[in-house]
Amino acid sequence: MITIPITLRMLIAKYLCLLKPFWLRKNNKTSVLLIIIILAMILGVVKIQVWLNDWNNDFFNALSQKETDKLWQLVLWFPALLGIFVLISVNKTWLIKLLTIRWREWLTDYYLNRWFADKNYYFTQIYGEHKNTDNPDQRIAEDILLLISKTLSLSFGFIQSLSMLITFTVILWESAGTLSFTVGGTEWNIQGYMVYTVVLIVIGGTLFTHKVGKRIRPLNVEKQRSEATFRTNLVQHNKQAELIALSNAESLQRQELSDNFHTIKENWHRLMNRQRWLDYWQNIYSRSLSVLPYFLLLPQFISGQINLGGLMKSRQAFMLVSNNLSWFIYKYDELAELAAVIDRLYEFHQLTEQRPTNKPKNCQHAVQVADASIRTPDNKIILENLNFHVSPGKWLLLKGYSGAGKTTLLKTLSHCWPWFKGDISSPADSWYVSQTPLIKTGLLKEIICKALPLPVDDKSLSEVLHQVGLGKLAARIHDHDRWGDILSSGEKQRIALARLILRRPKWIFLDETTSHLEEQEAIRLLRLVREKLPTSGVIMVTHQPGVWNLADDICDISAVL
């Protein structure tokens, strides 16, 4: 009984887990049909290789016999064989690419849905045993493509190699004949000796390849991680360019990037040193196999058991058998890379399966907190003895010193902080406005209106921009620019309030939303919000005393600590 090592069993289990979502889904007939067509093309390629092998035999026999007419027939027949071979091979590659993009599109959408479901993209950073998983963006952008492309190329390559192996093993057995020799007065006849020889050589070569290259897999995992970290830090540097320049922090950032690249360099050296030994062996192995069949067939040729055509046919069959039987040796690098990708993507898969079980009750008609306490992930108390009630149209101020836990309480009410005890009810679709609004690159109108439930015409948008003090931007709503870099902190907060007025949410959580504005302007804008959204319930955090008078009620966080 064959025993599969536990590490390999675990890898296979991870692999199947990643394959099942796409291939076991309903309405997948087109992808299955593509698989069938590609497999048929693979069999067509194998058949053409058999024809070419026969052509090789006939050509060299005609050449040795100097049969001019037959040689010309074979020369004219070769372009037809080549044309059919190229036609099938090119279209097979095209269909594999089509299947790749179909699979990638579906799987990318699948993992994006898992990542964004129930705010999972946020919880993956703070929740569970995999919270420190690096670069989830790379898992979606790169690892999915690598998984699919490697799976298809290796799978179809293996099937083609297996088909070629079976076919040409039969041909090699028949064409090479029997090796006869005498040892100690005993005559030995070994039929199919070429097949036995190539099998033994490849088995030994495969075992040696695995011994030499088994360290490549963890090095590939490290390579992907270090490259992703370097790329991410470069992106962050670009985003924070202004802050770095104002802080004169260039040398610090430069050193950090140099340290990141040093990690890449160290991994590269370890990987290339390990790869060198594998390359030594693969080159020795492949070069030796290219001439070995001549030596093995020499006794048969000298004794007249096979002619020149038979020699070339058997040699080609030997090469095809050895090459396809050596599939594992030649594909070891790709298999190691695929294994590393499986590990990384499965880790991300596990990450997106984690869900916090503790959530506030979803309540649309009020925010209710009774005998509640807010805690850290390690169960330390941040706030306790919390009790308040907010009805639609009412404003509540959360008051307390910096660091008291006001923002954490707002996160809890927004269903983004699962560490609490007690009775908390709040709407799951509330609108949270932070002191640093998300402003991306793009058309200004799209940036402001993208999340709105209904379309907004230019006139309405222009009117709201004037109301929040951004009238100068009304003429630029169709401009495409890097607004996150262009707008000041105060202008970004005005944009956030414009979004709020246009969206008209029923429940609003304001977290230092006007902190970058002068107090009188903050009062004016929040009064505008209350005027435009009279039925919306609002819970706000602010350190601007003049704004406190806008609240109907105050919950002093400091008093419950």
Curated annotation (Swiss-Prot):
Cross-referenced InterPro entries: AAA+_ATPase (IPR003593), ABC1_TM_dom (IPR011527), ABC1_TM_sf (IPR036640), ABC_transporter-like_ATP-bd (IPR003439), ABC_transporter-like_CS (IPR017871), ABC_transporter_sub-D (IPR050835), P-loop_NTPase (IPR027417)
Example of a GO cellular component annotation carried by this entry: membrane
Gene Ontology MF terms in the entry: ABC-type transporter activity; ATP binding; ATP hydrolysis activity
SMART domains: AAA
Ranges in the topological domain labelled Cytoplasmic: 1-3, 53-70, 173-187, 312-561
Stored CDD domains: ABCD_peroxisomal_ALDP
Keyword annotations: ATP-binding, Cell inner membrane, Cell membrane, Membrane, Nucleotide-binding, Transmembrane, Transmembrane helix, Transport
Main location group: membrane
Membrane topology, Periplasmic segments: 25-31, 92-151, 209-290
Protein family membership: Belongs to the ABC transporter superfamily.
Protein name: Inner membrane ABC transporter ATP-binding protein YddA
Organism taxonomic ancestry: Bacteria, Pseudomonadati, Pseudomonadota, Gammaproteobacteria, Enterobacterales
